[in-house]
Structure formats: C-alpha cells, structure tokens
C-alpha cells in the first residue's frame, strides 16, 4: 500500500509560487517553501550506486541565488528504505541563502498521529507545550480542528514520522540532527474547509496532511553558503505497514510497545539476528536469535 498520497486524478492547486501545487509523494522544497520547480520538467539521470542498487539524480539551479542543488534518490536490494542525498553548492563570489524541506504528502485520517518527541512546538511567533495544548494531544489529527502547522522545538531524536491506524500505514524519517533539525507537520484540518481543500486536490473522503523535514528548525530561517561553499545531508524514509505508533526507529529497525508486548519491524534482511530485551535496571528480560525480513 502507498504510504504517501497519490491523488487520482491529479488536480493542481493555485497555492504554489507559480500557481500549481500537487499533493503527490515527496516534494523537495528548494530554495524556498513550495518551490518553483514542483510542476516543471527537471533534468534527471539514472545512475548506478553499486551493489545492485538503483539511483535517480535530479538537478535544480536557482537563478536568483545562484545555488545549485542535486538530489540523489536510491533504492537498495533487500531493504525497504528510500535514501536521499542532498548536495547544495554556491558557485558565486557572494554569500547566498536558501531553505530545504522534504515534504511528504499524506492522506489524513482522524486517528493519524504525528510521531515526534519534542520539548515544545512553534507556530509563527507562538510557542506551545508539546504534545498537549489545553488538554488536547495535538499530535492526533482529529484534534487539529482547522488548518494549522507546528514545528518541533528541541526535537530529542534523529527520527520522526506518522502512523494511521485506519489505513494501517505510516512512515518514519531518519536523519542526523546535526544535518537536519527541522521536524514539522501541517494539516488542512478535518472541518468542512479542510476536507474541501483535500477534495480540490483529488483526495476524496479523507483529509490532507504533510510531514516535513528541514535543515533548520523552522521555515522562517535560511541556511547560508559562503562563496564556493557546499552543504551535504542524507535522509531516509522508512515505510510502515500494519505496525502501530513507533516508539523508536533507526535505519535498521522500528520499535513499538504496548502493555506486555514489544513489536519490531525490520528495514533490511537479517539472516541471523541476536536480540536481547533489557529492563530499566539493565537486567536481561528476554533473548532470541531469529531471521528478519523487511516488513
């Protein structure tokens, strides 16, 4: 099953810089939010990353800032991860700024949950506690009554994501916080206006949400490159099916727990895995040697 939105038919919305936005899969926002390239044909080449993997390389050059961007998307055999590498370069003799946010388009359901561990959330000039605001858990889609977004402040881990129990699907994004600090979600809301906006984009019967990862903590900040400077970052998307809300995730595993049980799902093939579960006192509660397969 698709974990990202794929509307049918595709109906561009007039909310982009050039007046055309589609809620489809992943959007690489550069050099600003909902970038000018979304509905434009882009230079694209296939390349061989080695070891049986397949790769696509996309290049975007911004005429205003002069910053050159390359996005590499890689799929590797024996795993269910989508790898992306971003390379930003400033070839000009002056300092220039840009933003980068990876934007995943998601079909929204009432119980869909934003999986994030943060101290606070930020919206324009307003800071709120997180995850509870006025007694409501704002991570859960049904509690976002109108169009709104939230940026995680002081996120505590290298991963975040989402999961929908209604669709039994979700995903986590994994990247080093030293490279990518931003963790954000946006919802059109589940009121009449929000559902109407989703229908206009070809998503019928559900709402629409976005889960975004950025270089900086909010979209009010720009990263700057000195003359000849460059910036490289790596990120991974890990799809989840029939799993639940994630408690922890890496590029190898995702973990969820409920009273009396732990569940583990793998992103890669493991022929002979030696696993141990320990308690808070360090005592080993259970050990097992098993084979794991993606999913």
Regions found by a protein language model. Give the residues of each.
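Acidic, contiguous internal or C-terminal segments within carbohydrate-active enzymes
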Residues: 1, 58-109, 234-235, 257
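Short Pro-Gly-centered flexible turn/kink motifs
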Residues: 1, 45, 86, 224-240
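A contiguous, surface-exposed recognition patch within enzymatic or periplasmic domains that forms
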Residues: 2-9, 80, 91-230
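Extended, loop-rich substrate-binding clefts of extracytoplasmic carbohydrate-active enzymes
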Residues: 26-80, 195-221, 227
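Short, acidic/polar linear motifs in exposed loop/turn regions
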Residues: 90-93, 241, 266-269
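Short, hydrophobic/aromatic beta-strand segments
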Residues: 93-100, 246-247, 272-276
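Short, Lys/Arg- and Gly-enriched loop/turn segments at beta-strand edges
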Residues: 239-250
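Beta-strand-rich binding/interaction modules
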Residues: 260-288
